[in-house]
């Protein structure tokens, strides 16, 4: 649902012409409600839509012609689904040797490669859900993080394949997968286990790495996360907050020593922070250069002054509403990557794309009448 579209989004935002080939009824994510309502609008800006029935020979022939003129094809179907329709890498490569074919799956080659998968499936089997939740209750991360990660890695692979084609003149098969993306994200925990012999604890009960790395309440019932992770930062904190006794306490000389003293140190710091209003504390921490963060909800970002000032939110028209979504988290030559077009209506660009393949207006209408192609 998200892995393939997120790959296309990265390429589209970077300037590629990305054509979304979807069924005549439209991509299923267009109809999701509730927690899924944001999927389609977030991952489909800057794309064109061709709505076509791939179960029909005429529909497949049109897509073959489109692929013949394309640099890249991406697919995010169940294993074997496109092969059965005649769109295998081998067949398309024979038609277009320069084609880069990117397959986004649950698993790379190996014993699991034929399994269908989902973001949550691989979060569970890849250990991320264990590290996120409680020991007895694994919990998926609060975003489709593996779908997005797998799609982003796919885009990186495509860019590398394009660069390789400049040298060799040949296309290639690129594969990205959810399970391997999850393993990549939990690599630090795997390495910790092998290096120390200790099983990493979930984040909910994890033994701290830093002496001060906590959420604190403020005088006005606010909350701030504060991180003091270096000895220099500790010196700054003690000096600026007037806590000289903590500065000279031999038990707190290094981060490792502060970790051991957290049992009494964190309550002491909580008392200090509790004297301040949230905004006053935030202003002071920013002024002295210590890491901090308010505890925000996703919708709070719609009014975030940094995102608003930096062009980090893109305005889009979706279902007769105006919404705002984050831009790709990049600047190129000091410029944020913006929106060229809103998420497309089903088949919005069908006439344009079919004309580019040599179809006359009458031929396009015949395809519509046969329900092979859908237009708005």
Tell me the role of every PLM-derived stretch.
Residues 286-308:
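Conserved PLP cofactor-binding pocket of PLP-dependent enzymes
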Residues 212-288, 292:
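Aromatic-enriched alpha-helical interface/lid elements that frame and gate functional surfaces
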Residues 217-219, 300-376:
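Terminal low-complexity tails and localization/encapsulation signals of metabolic enzymes
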Residues 144-159, 178-186, 229, 233:
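Mid-domain beta-loop-alpha active-site segment that forms a flexible
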Residues 1-157, 161-167, 316, 345, ...:
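N-terminal helix-loop segment corresponding to the beta1-alpha1 unit
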Residues 25, 106-108, 178-183, 220-222, ...:
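Glycine-rich beta-alpha junction loops
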Residues 109, 135-143, 166-182, 201-208, ...:
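Conserved Rossmann-fold dehydrogenase catalytic segment
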Residues 129, 151-171, 184-196, 238-245:
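Oxidoreductase and adenylate-handling cofactor-binding alpha/beta cores
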């Amino acid at each position: 649902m998200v892995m393939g579209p997120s790959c296309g989004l990265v390429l589209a935002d970077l300037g590629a012409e990305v054509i979304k080939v979807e069924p005549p009824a439209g991509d299923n994510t267009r109809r999701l409600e509730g927690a899924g309502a944001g999927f389609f609008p977030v991952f489909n800006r800057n794309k064109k839509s061709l709505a076509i029935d791939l179960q029909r020979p005429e529909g497949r022939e049109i897509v073959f012609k489109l692929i013949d003129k394309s640099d890249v094809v991406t697919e995010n179907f169940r294993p074997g689904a496109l092969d059965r329709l005649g769109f295998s890498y081998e067949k398309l490569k024979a038609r277009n040797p320069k084609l880069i074919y990117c397959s986004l799956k649950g698993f790379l080659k190996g014993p699991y490669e034929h399994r269908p998968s989902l973001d949550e499936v691989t979060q569970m089997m890849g250990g991320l859900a264990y590290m996120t939740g409680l020991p007895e209750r694994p919990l998926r991360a609060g975003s489709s993080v593996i779908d997005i990660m797998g799609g982003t890695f796919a885009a990186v692979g495509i860019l590398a394949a394009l660069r390789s084609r400049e040298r060799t003149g040949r296309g290639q098969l690129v594969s990205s997968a959810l399970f391997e993306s999850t393993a990549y994200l939990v690599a630090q925990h795997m390495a910790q286990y092998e290096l120390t012999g200790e099983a990493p604890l979930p984040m909910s009960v994890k033994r701290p790495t830093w002496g001060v790395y906590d959420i604190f309440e403020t005088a006005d019932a606010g909350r701030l996360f504060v991180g003091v992770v270096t000895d220099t930062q500790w010196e700054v904190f003690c000096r600026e907050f007037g806590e000289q006794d903590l500065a000279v306490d031999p038990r707190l000389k290094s981060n490792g020593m502060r970790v051991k003293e957290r049992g009494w140190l964190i309550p002491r710091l909580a008392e200090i922070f509790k004297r301040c209003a949230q905004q006053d504390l935030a202003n002071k921490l920013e002024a002295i250069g210590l890491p901090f963060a308010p505890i925000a909800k996703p919708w709070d970002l719609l009014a975030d002054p940094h995102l608003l000032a930096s062009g980090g939110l893109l305005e889009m028209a979706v279902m007769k509403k105006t919404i705002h979504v984050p831009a790709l988290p990049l600047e190129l030559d000091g410029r944020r990557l913006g929106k060229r077009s809103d998420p497309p209506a089903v088949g919005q660009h069908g006439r344009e794309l079919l004309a580019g393949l040599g179809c006359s207006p009458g031929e396009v209408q015949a395809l519509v009448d046969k329900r092979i192609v859908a237009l708005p």
